[in-house]
Amino acid sequence: MQWRGAGLWWPRRRQQQQQQQPPPPAFGPPAAAMVPPSRGVSPGLGGRPTSALLFLCYLNFVPSLGRQTSLTTSVLPRTEQSTTYADFIYFTAFEGSVRNVSEVSVEYLCSQPCVVHLEAVVSSEFRSSIPVYKKRWRNEKHLHTSRTQTVHVKFPSIMVYRDDYLIRHPISVSTVILRAWITHWHSGGGLNVRGEENLLHAVAKNYTLLQTVPPFERPFKDHQVCLEWNMDYLWSLWANRIPQCPLESDAVALLSFPYASSGENTGIVKKLQNFQNRELEATRSQRVDYPMVTISLWLYLLHYCEASLCGILYFVDSNEMYGTPSVFLTEDGSLHIQMHLVKGEDLAVKTKFTIPLKEWCRLDISFNGGQIVVTASIGWDLKSYHNQTISFHEDFYYNDTAGYFIIGGSRYVAGIEGFFGPVKYYRLRSLHPAQVLNPFLEKELAEQIKLYYERCTEVQDIISSYAATVQVGGERRETCDFHNSYLDLKRKYGRAEVCRGLPWEKELRDRHPSLFQSLLQMDLLTVPWNQNDSVLEIGARIFEKAVKRLSGVDGLHQISSAIPFLMDSSCCGYHKASYYLTVFYETGLNGPRDQLQGMLYSLVGGQGSERLSSMNLGYKHYQGVDSYPLDWELSYAYYSNIATKTPLDQHTLQGDQAYVETIRLKDDEILKVQTKEDGDVFMWLKHEATRGNAAAQQRLAQMLFWGQQGVAKNPEAAIEWYAKGALETEDPALIYDYAIVLFKGQGVKKNRRLALELMKKAASKGLHQAVNGLGWYYHKFRKNYAKAAKYWLKAEEMGNPDASYNLGVLYLDGIFPGVPGRNLTLAGEYFHKAAQGGHIEGTLWCSLYYITGNLETFPRDPEKAVVWAKHVAEKNGYLGHVIRKGLNAYLEGLWHEALLYYVLAAETGIEVSQTNLAHICEERPDLAGRYLGVNCVWRYYNFSVFQIDAPSFAYLKMGDLYYYGHQNQSQDLELSVQMYAQAALDGDSQGFFNLAALIEEGAVIPHHILEFLEIDPSLHSSNTSILQELYERCWSLSNEESLSPCSLAWLYLHLRLLWGAVLHSALIYFLGTFLLSVVIAWMVLYLQYISASGSSPAPAWVSADPTSSTPSPAVPPAADASDHDPPMMANGPEPRG
């Protein structure tokens, strides 16, 4: 096999387990002259000892800074020096550094016919002794005479020029050796002899070093070509840029925080990319058939594998096959290590040792070609537990970028039951365990996990012994009572029986007082006999007792007394209690916050596959909050586990489940229609359904089947209404629903014949769900894929998402009629179409494609994979049940219970519960402040705005909190603007109004926010222009028919602008002058009037005779007026003071 790559690479022979074949060595001066005998031969030059010694001599003879040297040595014995001493060779490089053409002067003397050799050898970081120039010539005539010849040594362009549009990858060389030697023609040094053998016959030799030039200090080459203008322009943009290699290492942290593996078919998916560093990437590519990697991971196993294999860490290639390396756990606790061979087969080996249970163990597995070294170390001091070396004579195929790694389970294999600690992966190095750097950073949390299971082992032993003792005693008493009447008389009249004391010391009883109290108060005779089932059943009873205490009127007061019982329930494997403890510790609900204990119980619940615990872990890693690291792949592992259970849970008739509905406590209209079995809405629907109203029958059946709108889940009653509606009405939806129930036998005996008739009847009425149902029938029961595809294509054209998903399944399984083989691309397209229509399984397939990135149409996007899996997981009925209990408590005014259940739901990361909890805390700040150890309003509104589907009012709330500041949170106008802008972008008029109000107060809206709102800052450069745009958008989005605050603000702004325009125009000066003139004239006339009134007590035209009230009609008015000095002012303006 050979190294793969371009350039001056040497062929590499396959390295077997015990034998290594090095690349050909370089050559140098004689070993006898320079190398001490004690050093021996270098291990890397074992292929040709003589040539290796010569190369070492050359290396030892290289001066550290010298450019030229003239040294002549002889390889013949000293007794023969007189015959060969005349032979010599010198040369001078006129330019001490590497150039495209370097002129070299060679001076030599031959005593016999000879051949003169000149050679240039270069070395780089990864390759050495590569000849790049060779020249030789004969000298037969000019003997015993010094000769000088000038040689123009031409080096490759990639060594002497910078990279440009033609020289894409110049080589950075570390050493350039120019060497020359003379061989006699008749002594085995002819032209037909290869260079390596020629050097052995050299009678004189010499060398010099040429100084190398770094790639970015080299000149550009004139290629004598004319570039197109676009190429020339692009070249000018980056011609003088010096790229910098990113800091890159082959060590990859696949996992840094503990992962709770539930032993199911979900795990962490990690995909490695090519190295950006060209040298690292070249090394990785060359080792495709010779892996040198190291895996280091921490494990805490609870149980060995129940199946034949359980996934630990394995590689899945692009063909969905296991690759190299793949590590599994077996049912007896040993390791199963599997490799894929170059020839296409697979090879596996099983370790001779087993992994210990309930101990933190570090596994270090190193691959060095065909050799595998497995080391298991126990505890934090890495006390060696076992070491095993396995050797193969096969070539392993290794390409860590042509697929993805999985930690834990997948759809191919279940994962281990336990916990993963940090996982480190060295891509290019085979390391000894002492060289591996993989510390457990969360050591305190790991210690708590170990202590928890030690305590739980003790609790389970107590419960098992106690239950067994009580049950055996009860069974014996029942048996004796049935068969022996004499004992009846003895118990009645004899001495009372005394129970035998249970074998527990006082110290043990003191450590578990709540457990013994629960056991004494519990009727254990009804507990199942099986040990695991009995422990779980007792845990469930302890939990119900604790929850009953928490559900009282003052339930939050009882949290501290309920915690010991919840701990006992958690130890019994009933992990609903674990989630309660998680929330209590992480939120400080009526107690101090303890993040470490919160993480502990969250991980324990996740390991037990508890739905709400897994969603809590997924959410915390998705957002990176509460000291959980941001890790989308880890978040996906938790969310996908619950998402895959959600469709199964929805079709499970038993269990505390309810439909997840988006009901906001601030929406009074929605709250009014919430009902119960004795509520007005339900009773009215039942009345209408009894009268034969098909719509009422369907709605009533849906409410009872799924547990919607406050009605408890009751599948049996729902099926009765489905049957009544299907058989009595012609409504196609009811007919279809009842047909599905009959097909699946959900709460009723299966009746495939009647179901098919009803399905055909509904399809004939044009119901696309029924058309899809017919396709499902022919696919599942008849295996008639052609007919199934026909119905599904028809239903898909009608817009049915189920049909899109089913068509995708046909392509995925490779059974689509007329299409040979599988077509994953088309399957992915149909799954994506189904997911966009709300299909749960289609969404799950899309999330899987996004996390693996194995389909070209689904580029790897871990964040999008988490979003899609989270969307499905939040439809889980067990979460819906908790939300419904909180809503019912709120409607009934039970504040303690409402707060408890909404905190439990909000910590899973579902947005509607987060905003509802914040609303409760706003309504009852006294309750939140007293019992919650977190800033409730701030925490949950802040959580909600980081959701994908966050409501606009949450952005407005956070904007207000940033604007005013809230409790310990400081004011932040910049973030306030961002929140208001996001609300405005979501179409909320209040967001535009608040932004305008900030501008009115003097705040400045950054340009990127304006561009975010699609407001061009160049067109709206002034605050006035921006205000106009904001108020206009606010008015256009307002839902009020009458005048709204937005319209009034817009009108007021324009009035101000109009008034400002008037004040700044020329007309104002004219009007001002005119009014001033009028006022002055009036003042003068008024003063004249006052002075005239003071000299004459009555006007001249007024008669002194009181009987005369008017002037004489004989006097004309004009003449009458002219006879008096003061003018008549009866019609003048009234004075205004």
UniProtKB/Swiss-Prot annotation:
The keyword Phosphoprotein appears for this protein: yes
Protein name per its UniProtKB record: Protein sel-1 homolog 3
Keywords, comma-separated and alphabetical: Glycoprotein, Membrane, Phosphoprotein, Repeat, Transmembrane, Transmembrane helix
Compartmental location: Membrane
InterPro entries: Sel-1L3, Sel1-like, TPR-like_helical_dom_sf
Positions of the UniProt region annotated as Disordered: 1-42, 1100-1137
Highest rank taxon of the organism: Eukaryota
Keyword Glycoprotein included in the entry's annotation: yes
Residues bearing carbohydrate: N206, N387, N942
Sel1-like repeats: 575-609, 611-647, 694-730, 732-767, 768-800, 801-839, 840-877, 952-988
Gene Ontology cellular-component annotations: membrane
Modification type Phosphoserine: residues: S613
Membrane-topology descriptor: Single-pass membrane protein
SS bonds (residue pairs): none
Compositional bias (Low complexity): 1102-1120
TM regions (residue ranges): 1067-1087
